[in-house]
Amino acid sequence: KRNYYPWLSIMLCICLNANAQSIIEYDIVLSGGRVIDPETKLDAIRNVGILNNRIAQISTEPLKGKQTINVSGLVVAPGFIDLHVHGRSNVEQEYQLHDGVTTALELEWGIEHLGKWYESRKGKALINYGASVNWPFERFKAIGKYQKAVDSLMQLTINGEANIGAMTNTILRAANETITADALNQTLVNIKTSLNEGGIGIAAPIGYLPKTNPNEMYQAYKLAGELQVVVFSHVRNPDIISIQEAIA
C-alpha cells in the first residue's frame, strides 16, 4: 500500500507558500529585474519584495506591493562596498549612490580627527560610511609644533570638507622630518585612540612620506599586529623592497 501523505504535505506547503506570497503586501516590489546574488550564485529574472527596509522575498511569482517599480532590463544586486574613496560629504555620496555604492570607506589615506568626523556624519550620510586611522595625521599631530595646523584641520573635518588636497598639503609639511622617539611613541598612542574611536584599521600611505625612517613604519605595523587590526598600505616605492617592507 502506497503512502501518499508525504507527497500531499509537500504539495500543500508549496501551495501555501505561493498563496502567502500573493497575500502579503510588500512596501516595495522590484518587478522583473535581473537579480544577481554572489552568495547564492543566483543570476535570473526575479521579483523582489521589500518589507520594513529588508528583502523579504525573491520570487518568480508576481508580488503585491504598496509601490511597484518595473526594473526590467536592470540589474538588482547587493550594494557595492568601495574601499578607496576620498570624498567625505553628501555631494560625493550622491554620485556613489548612482554607481550602486551603498558603503563608502576611506581606507587608503584615512581621516584626521576620526571621532569628530564620525560625529559630524551621524544622521546626515546618504550611505554607510567609515574610515581608517590616518597615520600621517597622527604622526603630524605627535610632532607637537604643528598644533595650530592640527586645530585648523579640525574645522575642515567638522564642516565635512572634501578638500583632500588642502589636508594632505598641510599634513605633508612634516613628511621629510625625522621624528623623535617621544613623538614616535605619541604617534602610536594617537593611533590607538583613533582605533578606539572607530578606526577601521590603520592607513599607512607611506608612498606620500617616502623618506620616513623604516622603524616608524615598522612600529606602526607591529602595533597593528599586537592589536590584530588591518593595515591599508600605499607602499613607499613601486618596487619589491617596498612590498617586502609592507608584509615583513
Task: Give residue spans per PLM region.
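Histidine-rich, glycine-flanked metal-binding segment
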Residues: 22-29, 35-77
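Metallo-beta-lactamase
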Residues: 79-86
